[in-house]
């Protein structure tokens, strides 16, 4: 990925030199041309296109902010309701993530959303224990974590 970014920057510099105009707009146009060239060459040079991973990172960040807003709304509803009709609980969520970086990212994203807190991992790192302020359905919570955070993390790292 670093090689592709460097190659894209070189293409942008070459573009600026060919244009004989040293402005940020020309550099940006050259960078976009470089992205297109690398996209076309990815089939011949057999490398994974680096913009795919950058797009996955952008999707992960936007997913986190969406989940953050939804979790804030849920916690506000709980706090402002006259009756404390909640079911707090600890859920063991199985995970497909393997590396320490992936597991740490998942734990951080879960802990940063209001109402949930990642507590610990199992000894074999196949389960993450999560405390939630309201768990009416454990299976739905597990499915939600798999379908949102875990899937997005796997897109970024694979």
From Swiss-Prot:
**InterPro entries in alphabetical order:** Cation_antiport_E
The entry's keywords: Antiport, Cell membrane, Hydrogen ion transport, Ion transport, Membrane, Sodium, Sodium transport, Transmembrane, Transmembrane helix, Transport
Q: Its Gene Ontology molecular function terms?
A: antiporter activity; monoatomic cation transmembrane transporter activity
Output the Gene Ontology cellular-component terms.
plasma membrane
Membrane topology of the entry: Multi-pass membrane protein
**Role description:** Mnh complex is a Na(+)Li(+)/H(+) antiporter involved in Na(+) and/or Li(+) excretion and Na(+) resistance. Na(+)/H(+) antiport consumes a transmembrane electrical potential, and is thus inferred to be electrogenic. Does not transport K(+), Ca(2+) or Mg(2+).
Q: Other comments? A: Mrp-dependent antiport apparently occurs by a secondary, proton motive force-dependent mechanism, but the similarity of several Mrp proteins to membrane-embedded subunits of energy-coupled NADH dehydrogenase complexes raises the possibility that there is a capacity for electron transport that could provide a primary energy coupling option for Mrp functions.
Q: Which family is annotated?
A: Belongs to the CPA3 antiporters (TC 2.A.63) subunit E family.
Instruction: Give the protein name, as stated in the record.
Output: Na(+)/H(+) antiporter subunit E
* UniProt source species: Alkalihalophilus pseudofirmus (strain ATCC BAA-2126 / JCM 17055 / OF4)
């Amino acid at each position: 990925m670093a090689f592709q970014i460097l190659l894209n920057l070189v293409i942008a510099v070459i573009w600026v030199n060919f244009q004989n105009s040293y402005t940020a707009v020309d550099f940006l146009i050259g960078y976009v041309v470089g992205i297109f060239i690398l996209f076309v060459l990815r089939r011949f040079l057999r490398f994974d296109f680096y913009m795919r991973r950058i797009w996955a990172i952008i999707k992960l960040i936007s997913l986190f902010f969406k989940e953050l807003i939804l979790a804030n709304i849920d916690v506000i509803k709980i706090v402002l309701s006259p009756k404390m009709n909640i079911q707090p609980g600890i859920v063991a969520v199985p995970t497909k993530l393997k590396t320490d970086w992936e597991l740490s990212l998942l734990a951080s994203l879960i802990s940063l959303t209001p109402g949930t807190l990642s507590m610990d991992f199992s000894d074999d790192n196949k389960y993450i224990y999560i405390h939630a302020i309201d768990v009416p359905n454990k299976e739905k919570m597990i499915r939600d974590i798999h379908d949102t955070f875990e899937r997005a993390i796997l897109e970024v790292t694979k």
